[in-house]
Curated annotation (Swiss-Prot):
F-type ATPases have 2 components, F(1) - the catalytic core - and F(0) - the membrane proton channel. F(1) has five subunits: alpha(3), beta(3), gamma(1), delta(1), epsilon(1). F(0) has four main subunits: a(1), b(1), b'(1) and c(10-14). The alpha and beta chains form an alternating ring which encloses part of the gamma chain. F(1) is attached to F(0) by a central stalk formed by the gamma and epsilon chains, while a peripheral stalk is formed by the delta, b and b' chains. The lineage of its organism: Eukaryota, Viridiplantae, Streptophyta, Embryophyta, Tracheophyta. In plastids the F-type ATPase is also known as CF(1)CF(0). Belongs to the ATPase B chain family. It comes from Atropa belladonna (Belladonna). This is ATP synthase subunit b, chloroplastic.
């Protein structure tokens, strides 16, 4: 293992005339090339991103529609429960002497169960919307990253020749070996 590490370290000590390094001078890093690369990424990624967002929007809208349908069903159930409640209330009035407390408990249980059902449906709708939004955001991030990576790799591959590739790879391996020794 030490021999492998030594070989990486020796690769990292090239003469500075032919090696790569980080240039922190913003004026020397050629911001025009960076802006061209970003412009190409934005130009080509815009259509894909737009289509992806439209698809996600449709899915979210469909989910919202489904949730609204569930909500309407819950409202219908609530109306049925209210009509049953009215019926129970009229019966309670008739049988007040015989079992007022029993009927009152049934009424409260019916109301509580109806409200719990509505709360559960509302929570389900909100969770579904939140889940779909998060999934859409994650997919957009992944697509944008993939497009940027493809564009950057394409630009790098078109600009670098084999010798430059080998020198860059060797320099990076040397830097990684040096960083590994520092962390060890």
């Amino acid at each position: 293992m030490k021999n492998v590490t030594d070989s990486f370290v020796s690769l990292g000590h090239w003469p500075s005339a032919g090696s790569f390094g980080f240039n922190t001078d913003i004026l020397a890093t050629n911001p025009i090339n960076l802006s061209v690369v970003l412009g190409v990424l934005i130009f080509f990624g815009k259509g894909v991103l737009s289509d992806l967002l439209d698809n996600r929007k449709q899915r979210i809208l469909n989910t919202i529609r489904n949730s609204e349908e569930l909500r309407e069903g819950a409202i219908e159930q609530l109306e049925k429960a209210r009509s049953r409640l009215r019926k129970v209330e009229t019966e309670a009035e008739q049988f007040r002497v015989n079992g007022y407390s029993e009927i009152e408990r049934e009424k409260l249980n019916l109301i509580n169960s109806t409200y719990k059902t509505l709360e559960q449906l509302e929570n389900y709708k909100n969770e579904t919307i939140q889940f779909e939004q998060q999934r859409a955001i994650n997919q957009v991030r992944q697509r944008v990253f993939q497009q940027a990576l493809r564009g950057a790799l394409g630009t790098l591959n078109s600009c670098l020749n084999n010798e430059l590739h080998l020198r860059t790879i060797s320099a990076n391996i040397g830097m990684l070996g040096t960083m590994k020794e520092i962390t060890d």
